[in-house]
Each structure stands twice: as C-alpha cells, then as structure tokens.
Amino acid sequence: MTNIRKTHPLLKIINNSLVDLPAPSNLSSWWNFGSLLGVCLAVQILTGVFLAMHYTSDTTSAFNSVAHICRDVNYGWVLRYLHANGASMFFICLYVHVGRGLYYGSYMYSETWNVGILLLFAVMATAFMGYVLP
C-alpha cells in the first residue's frame, strides 16, 4: 500500500518540496542559523520602529520616555524586552553562523566570504554606534 502523500497530486507536490527534498547529507541543524538571523533582524526592525514611535532622545526626558513605554504603552515592556533580548539573540546567531562557515570551510569561496565579513563589520559598527556610544 502506497502512502497518500506520494499518490495524491497536491500532496505529492508538497511532499517533493518539503518532505523528500533532495539535500546534501551534511545539511544539519547548523544551517538554520542563517534563517534565524533573518527572523531576528525582522524582529529587531519591527520592535525598533514601534519603540521609536514613543522614545524621546532629549537628555532631560529620555528616562521618562522609557518609563512611559514600559508603563503606559500597551505591551510596551514586551517590545522593550524583545528588542533588547533580540539583539543578543541576533549576535549569538551571527557568531554561530560565522562559526559554521569556518567549520565547513566556506572561507574557500573568497568572494562570498569577504562580502559576509564586510556585513559582519557593518553590523558590529552599527551596534557600536547605536547601543554602546549613547
């Protein structure tokens, strides 16, 4: 008896695309960190935009605006903590992603590797300018 996912026309398309996807044998869970980087970046951008709607950068009212976000904005404390912890998770995923590339020898593809290193430096410079200096 054959499986329905291999005989039904619609399920056969889904099966060939997701379940029985031909993939290399060294494709492991370490390869998910590139996708997690995209998710973390999207969360950072969204929470950053929503936090920027209520934040005031003036030195006399900056603390009060953060207190306003945490106390008066609906789920503002969740946005703030998601943004703070999302940055940490982003860098953890970034370092694991680079480490995976080092382990599997991706540095042999010099053009792709150099673009990735430039992106790494740009992310680190952005984090330094936006989070460390202020």
UniProtKB/Swiss-Prot annotation:
Record text on cofactor binding: Binds 2 heme b groups non-covalently.
Binding positions for heme b b566 per the UniProt entry: H97
Protein name (record): Cytochrome b
Assembly with partners or alone: The cytochrome bc1 complex contains 11 subunits: 3 respiratory subunits (MT-CYB, CYC1 and UQCRFS1), 2 core proteins (UQCRC1 and UQCRC2) and 6 low-molecular weight proteins (UQCRH/QCR6, UQCRB/QCR7, UQCRQ/QCR8, UQCR10/QCR9, UQCR11/QCR10 and a cleavage product of UQCRFS1). This cytochrome bc1 complex then forms a dimer.
Keyword match ATP-binding: no
Lipid bilayer topology: Multi-pass membrane protein
Annotated GO CC locations: mitochondrial inner membrane
UniProt-listed GO biological process terms: mitochondrial electron transport, ubiquinol to cytochrome c
Function, in words: Component of the ubiquinol-cytochrome c reductase complex (complex III or cytochrome b-c1 complex) that is part of the mitochondrial respiratory chain. The b-c1 complex mediates electron transfer from ubiquinol to cytochrome c. Contributes to the generation of a proton gradient across the mitochondrial membrane that is then used for ATP synthesis.
PROSITE patterns: CYTB_NTER (PS51002)
Gene Ontology molecular function, alphabetical: metal ion binding; ubiquinol-cytochrome-c reductase activity
Residues binding heme b b562, per UniProt: H83
CDD domains on file: Cytochrome_b_N
Subcellular location: Mitochondrion inner membrane
Cofactor or coenzyme needed: heme b
Other remarks on this protein: Heme 1 (or BL or b562) is low-potential and absorbs at about 562 nm, and heme 2 (or BH or b566) is high-potential and absorbs at about 566 nm.
Regions crossing the membrane: 33-53, 77-98, 113-133
Keyword Heme on entry: yes
Keywords: Electron transport, Heme, Iron, Membrane, Metal-binding, Mitochondrion, Mitochondrion inner membrane, Respiratory chain, Transmembrane, Transmembrane helix, Transport, Ubiquinone
Protein family: Belongs to the cytochrome b family.
